[in-house]
Amino acid sequence: MFSLQDLCRKNTFFLPNGFNKHTLQLLGLYWKEHGSVHRVEKDNIMIQNELVLSINDALLLAGEEGDTDVVQLLLLWEGNLHYAIIGALKTEKYNLICEYHSQIEDWHILLPMIQDPETFEKCHDLSLQCDFICLLQHAIKYNKLSILVKYKEDLLNIRIRHRVQSLFVLACENRRTEIIEWIGQNLSIPEPDAIFSIAIATKDLELFSLGYKIIFDYMQRQGILQLSNGLRMVVLNRHISMAIDNGLLPFVLETLKHGGNIHRALSYAVSHNRRKILDYLIRQKNIPPNTIERLLYLAVKNQSSRKTLNLLLSYINYKVKNVKKLVEHVVDHNSTLVVTILLEKKINLIDAVLTRLVKHSTYFRVREFIQEFSISPEKFIKIAVREKRNVIIKGISEDIWENPAERITYLKQIVHTIKYESGREFLINIIHTIYQSYSLKPEEILKLARFYVKHNATTHFKDLCKYLWLNRGTESKKLFLECLEIADKKDFPAIKNIVSEYINYLFTAGAITKEEIMQVYTLEYAMY
């Protein structure tokens, strides 16, 4: 009989109709008040050769009835014990639960399988190491709102009120919309803004929108919706920043719908280089050109990407009305990319930027700009002369022409191109400081002396003559005669007086004759 029972209980087949109740009981294939039971497929059973149930559904029913024999049979057919336990909990058949209690390591595993809130709570109560908050956490996790409703008064108790925040966050993380709404309507949430952070992190627009409903409904109930307008804008601006930072256009639009500031959204889009968001907002909101130009200044200030700058410039057809303002931002924030972009469109701001750089910036910044845009030394030096920036001229000219004589030569050439006298004098002063700082060859000094005479640089020429007389003496006769001739032709009396003094020295020393002097002097020097 044991072998037959074992065969019948472990195999899939149809029972003969001739088996009576007693035989079925002996075989262990009889279910009280239901009739015969046998396995017909891997996961199914048949009751009384008519009703087909899944093994786990049958376990649930057997558990509800507390029928340990049938449970044992169904477990033999690879059923899940958890269903029997759940059924037993539902009808409080604790004898069956006690029999299998040791086989359940963690009662929390059963919770997602339970639909009925009361059974859910009974199951959780079997986890003796857990507390009340643990029950609420799992109620949220498995969407059992009725359990939270049941314990509403406990949640309002000051002793556990501080746990509401963590429960709210858990509901948001698990996207339990009904529970989130209920918490918002019935409990005080210390930091409701957490819902927005979670919504953005999970890209859940529905949750994001629900956050506004919770916050504004709360303000409405408290009668502070209008009074809290300032706080409201702070919150909305923060949400705009979060949404744009993550590149979430729908979230930006949702915030704007609830009163967010379009200008703040545009500014954040520029600052975060969110070109697609920026493009959409400009087109859809009909942003005027003067606002776009202000956004361009912001883009320059934040050193935005080429794409962002190009987008903004394209909306104003690359025509900047307030060039001065743009140049200020380029220089003040060392952001020259916009200059490059405009140059590609045949709009040249190099001179304007260089002028402001020379006027307000450092030697290193100016040098960097000159190198970046391959600016000629003459252009830079003329601007620096106009702005009286002698230190920058000295520094950069030294970088360009390391040899002092070569440096003086090129600076002298630039002096010839400057049309206003004060500018020429300023650059000649710089040339003279170079002469004073280095030892030039005699021939270079002679060239410099002639240059000073041609430009009536009296003080510097006098300084040079003194040097020549002390170091070369009568060897400078030819130079003095040439300088006298130039000064006479250009009518530079001060220069003539200086030269005359040294010619007198030469004459006294017998190094020059009266005839040589007469070849140069005009009639006023006939006395010689």
UniProtKB/Swiss-Prot annotation:
Tagged with keyword Repeat: yes
Localisation: Host cytoplasm
Pfam families from the UniProt entry: DUF249
Induction data: Expressed in the early phase of the viral replicative cycle.
GO biological process: symbiont-mediated suppression of host innate immune response; symbiont-mediated suppression of host JAK-STAT cascade via inhibition of JAK1 activity; symbiont-mediated suppression of host type I interferon-mediated signaling pathway
Name of protein: Protein MGF 505-7R
Family named by the database record: Belongs to the asfivirus MGF 505 family.
Annotated ANK repeat ranges: 54-83, 261-291
Record text on subunit structure and interactions: Interacts with host STING1. Interacts with host JAK1; this interaction leads to JAK1 degradation. Interacts with host JAK2; this interaction leads to JAK2 degradation. Interacts with host RELA; this interaction inhibits NF-kappa-B promoter activity.
Gene3D superfamilies registered for this protein in UniProt: Ankyrin repeat-containing domain
Subcellular location, principal: host cell
InterPro entries: Ankyrin_rpt-contain_sf, MGF_505
Entries under SUPFAM superfamilies matching the protein: Ankyrin repeat
Keywords for this protein: ANK repeat, Early protein, Host cytoplasm, Host-virus interaction, Inhibition of host innate immune response by virus, Inhibition of host interferon signaling pathway by virus, Inhibition of host JAK1 by virus, Interferon antiviral system evasion, Repeat, Viral immunoevasion
GO cellular component, one term: host cell cytoplasm
Species, as recorded: African swine fever virus (isolate Tick/Malawi/Lil 20-1/1983) (ASFV)
Role according to the record: Plays a role in virus cell tropism, and may be required for efficient virus replication in macrophages. Interferes with host NF-kappa-B promoter activity mediated by TLR8. Mechanistically, inhibits the phosphorylation and subsequent nuclear translocation of host NF-kappa-B RELA subunit downstream of TLR8. Promotes the expression of the autophagy-related protein host ULK1 to degrade host STING and inhibit the interferon response. Also inhibits JAK1- and JAK2-mediated signaling and thus negatively regulates the IFN-gamma signaling.
